[in-house]
């Protein structure tokens, strides 16, 4: 019975880094920039709400599933002088501003949030985060930002779903009644630089954290800092067609470095399709639609790159989004 208890303990310990970085497991990680790096919070001049669902190893009895909801947007004060200008492109007014006026007009604050929930029927990982960033134009075409956030991570075992020979064992009864649980509160920071054709950012997660558990075995702190670098570029192949590669690299001392990459073709602001890769883990394809100016939908399918049986080889992911614009403005995304 002690062996069973040790296995359960090891599952919680192994789940901790996953809970801290569960957003990276999404194939469409670019849908949640504020979860990757706090500095990307409010990178767009509009508000967006996303909801997604990911099913891993479809067909397996204890297949993990992941759900998330997020929001991201920016606060900025529009120049009221635009209201008196009757032109088809209101942004044209900015062309006549001095550099100082331009920076003042386009500096803005970003606010974002993310909540993710992962379960396989026996254990649960959930995480919530709230992020803030300040964006300041460096030139007419390049801006920089700095951000910070706080994340709450919670991992626990649903002990009632396990079956053992001796149900009267005191360890099993304790797990059933109290659950084995681990909680963490972390501080995340990041910086970024971006323009209409590129973005690049660096962030640290778990810079500091508070920790609480339901068992003395977890009270010994094991602190570490995770580092993340992400970058993207878009190349205009024609006025209507763009090539958009992007990459995400994550590293901490507890796990091997992870590399997540994708490349997409985007047709106007209507349709995109591409391929993705996670080093030594999986590869797949993605497709997305922009239904009008506000509603978006993305789908991804992944195939495991390592040897596995067919029942564990189907990973599906769906993301729905809704964008809110200021009246009279339509802008392209800075993050892909």
Segments (PLM) and residue ranges:
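Sec-dependent N-terminal signal peptides
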Residues: 4-14
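Hydrophobic alpha-helical membrane context
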Residues: 14-15, 49
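Sec/Tat signal peptide C-region and signal peptidase I cleavage site
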Residues: 16-20
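Subset of outer-membrane beta-barrel
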Residues: 21-336
């Amino acid at each position: 019975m002690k062996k069973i208890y040790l296995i359960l303990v090891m599952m919680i310990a192994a789940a901790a880094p996953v809970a801290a970085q569960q957003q990276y497991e999404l194939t469409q990680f670019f849908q949640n920039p504020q979860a990757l790096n706090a500095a990307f919070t409010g990178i767009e001049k509009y508000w967006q709400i996303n909801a997604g669902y990911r099913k891993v190893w479809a067909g397996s009895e204890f297949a993990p599933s992941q759900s998330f909801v997020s929001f991201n947007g920016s606060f900025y004060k529009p120049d009221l002088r635009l209201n008196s200008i009757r032109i088809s492109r209101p942004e044209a007014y900015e062309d006549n501003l001095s550099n100082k006026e331009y920076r003042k007009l386009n500096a803005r604050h970003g606010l974002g949030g993310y909540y993710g929930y992962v379960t396989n029927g026996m254990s649960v990982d959930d995480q919530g985060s709230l992020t803030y960033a300040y964006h300041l134009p460096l030139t007419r075409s390049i801006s920089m930002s700095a951000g910070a956030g706080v994340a709450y991570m919670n991992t626990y075992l649903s002990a009632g779903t396990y079956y053992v020979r001796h149900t009267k064992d005191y360890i099993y009864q304790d797990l059933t009644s109290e659950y084995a649980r681990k909680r963490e509160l972390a501080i995340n920071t990041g910086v970024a630089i971006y323009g209409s054709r590129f973005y690049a950012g660096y962030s640290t997660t778990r810079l500091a954290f508070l920790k609480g558990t339901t068992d003395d075995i977890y009270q010994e702190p094991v602190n570490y800092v995770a580092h993340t670098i992400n970058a993207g570029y878009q190349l205009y192949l024609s006025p209507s067609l763009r090539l958009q590669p992007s990459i995400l690299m994550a590293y901490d001392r507890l796990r091997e470095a992870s590399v997540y990459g994708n490349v997409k073709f985007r047709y106007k602001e209507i349709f995109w399709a591409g391929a993705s890769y996670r080093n030594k883990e999986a590869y797949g394809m993605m497709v997305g639609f922009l239904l009008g100016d506000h509603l978006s939908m993305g789908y991804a399918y992944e195939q495991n790159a390592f040897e596995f049986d067919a029942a564990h080889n189907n990973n599906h992911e769906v993301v729905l989004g809704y964008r809110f614009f200021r009246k009279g403005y339509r802008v392209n995304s800075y993050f892909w």
